[in-house]
Amino acid sequence: MYVGTRRIDKASELIKPEDELEIRGKSNPYASRGGLKLEKAITSFQADLRGKVCMDIGAATGGFTDVCLQNGAAHVYAIDVGYGQFSWKLRNDPRVTLYERTNARLLTPDMLPLHPTVTVMDVSFISIRLILPVAAQLMGEEGVFYTLIKPQFEAGRDRIGKKGVIHDPKVHEDVLREIVEFAPTIGWQGEQLDYSPIKGPGGNIEFLGKITVRTQETEPVTPEIIHELVKKAHQELKGSSHK
């Protein structure tokens, strides 16, 4: 959305009544470009959100919330530490409860009258490992995570390249392995992984994960699976010669 040459990217941004608005670029069926990432996760992991109560942690403009609703979710708790970004349309949707200026690590059951069993997550400047235990406790054993994994916020400064971009596929492998190894420490497991169809800021390759309660019926993701996934992601998104 543009006013003249100025890009409008926040719902809270003020414009004049006489300003002419222009929509540029390819049409997106969701409230943000990020929705395309969760869309792939739902397809890849065969997620069924019909009738489910979901938490969208790191809701921002509402792309993930929009995907949940368009895939049949009964209600979405949209949670974000920021404010003023969330889609006006979604903000006024009775199926959405919006918590702005809210730290997901401080969520308590009394804040969520409807019991969520699905968490979708897209967070920045924090590791998902700090949020998984809280959300897992809120959802209980029937819960499932569909999360975006941003290596640039998982790896630590010593493993990140210039301008916050990770180019080394080995670092991507390490990050995914560390998350898969972390899940069992809270009684969960990394069940499936894929890569995001679009890059993040600066051209960062990002990944998608399905994390569920640990059972004997499902096999966790192995290092070999991670290696092949990262290899494919680099080939598809960067033309890397990762071996």
Residue ranges of each PLM-predicted region?
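Conserved SAM-binding loop of SAM-dependent methyltransferases across substrates and taxa
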Residues: 61-72
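Short, glycine-/aromatic-enriched active-site segment of Class I SAM-dependent methyltransferases
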Residues: 151-168
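Flexible, glycine-/basic-rich loop-and-beta segments that form/coincide
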Residues: 205, 211-243
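S4-like RNA-binding module at protein N-termini
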Residues: 1-49
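Conserved class I S-adenosyl-L-methionine
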Residues: 49-60
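A short glycine-rich, Lys/Arg-flanked "PGG" loop and its adjoining helix->strand segment in the class I
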Residues: 129-146
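S-adenosyl-L-methionine
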Residues: 77-130
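Short alpha-helix
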Residues: 172-186
